[in-house]
């Protein structure tokens, strides 16, 4: 936003990923959206307020978001806060669904509107630390539903083992085909993080905490049917999860009061 289940064989399933999939309410009435229709790149800032200045930070962020909206910025920014984890002090501010050329247009607006200066005057004094990332959605392996009713996002961040991307993608192809063949009703999105280590992120939107319940049918049951056998399902899941060195999971809550959404 600155101008610029068990710990056994089934942790080798998508315990780290799809078993974290919330048992969301049916989404058949929602329209499935291909992220490539508009763009699949997100701009993502992570900001930490200075110690003891959370209230001041939020007031300044609200002011700066209003300034950017009034100044006609082409990007729309959404703000999120973690609600689980060891660090609950940071804010994630992101703008989604862009093509790369959109960043040139936003940079041009930023220079003309002097957005850097406005940031430094309004929000900068209350920021202790900032990190910046891009995120590229893998639309071919995602099953996304747009809805204005999402409040929470469950995010699993997985660090890929060196040289494991090929095997991981083969497994993901099998899983995605089963998801589509079985008409799995739950939305999710895979995205590669640009900046830092080589991480694949799984984002699960939720309209309430109730939607964090396990899906029904379970992921394994769905894959067993879609891939033809329990052995094939377990093999694909093991191949997928075995491609990662570590994983982190957290839940974020939307903060529309600190965003520039329409």
Which residues make up each language-model segment?
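Bacterial N-terminal signal peptides
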Residues: 11-23
């Amino acid at each position: 936003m600155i101008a610029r289940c068990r710990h056994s064989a089934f942790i080798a399933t998508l315990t780290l990923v799809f078993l974290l999939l919330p048992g969301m309410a049916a989404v058949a009435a929602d329209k499935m959206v291909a992220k490539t229709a508009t763009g699949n790149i997100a701009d993502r800032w992570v900001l930490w307020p200075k110690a003891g200045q959370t209230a001041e930070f939020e007031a300044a962020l609200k002011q700066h978001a209003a300034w950017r909206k009034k100044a006609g910025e082409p990007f729309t920014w959404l703000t999120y806060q973690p609600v689980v984890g060891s660090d609950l002090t940071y804010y994630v501010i992101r703008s989604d669904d862009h093509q790369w050329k959109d960043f040139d247009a936003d940079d041009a607006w930023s220079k003309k509107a002097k957005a850097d200066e406005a940031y430094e005057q309004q929000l900068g004094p209350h920021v202790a630390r900032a990190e910046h990332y891009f995120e590229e959605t893998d639309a071919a392996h995602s099953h996304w539903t747009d809805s204005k009713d999402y409040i929470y996002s469950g995010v699993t961040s997985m660090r890929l083992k060196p040289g494991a991307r090929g095997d991981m993608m083969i497994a993901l192809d099998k899983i995605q085909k089963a998801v589509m063949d079985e008409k799995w009703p739950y939305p999710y999105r895979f995205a590669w993080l640009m900046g830092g280590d080589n991480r694949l992120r799984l984002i699960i939107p939720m309209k309430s905490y109730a939607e964090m319940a396990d899906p029904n049918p379970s992921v394994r049951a769905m894959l067993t049917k879609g891939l033809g056998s329990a052995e094939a399902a377990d093999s694909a899941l093991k191949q997928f999860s075995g491609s990662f060195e570590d994983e982190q999971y957290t839940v974020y809550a939307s903060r529309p009061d600190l965003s520039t959404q329409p």
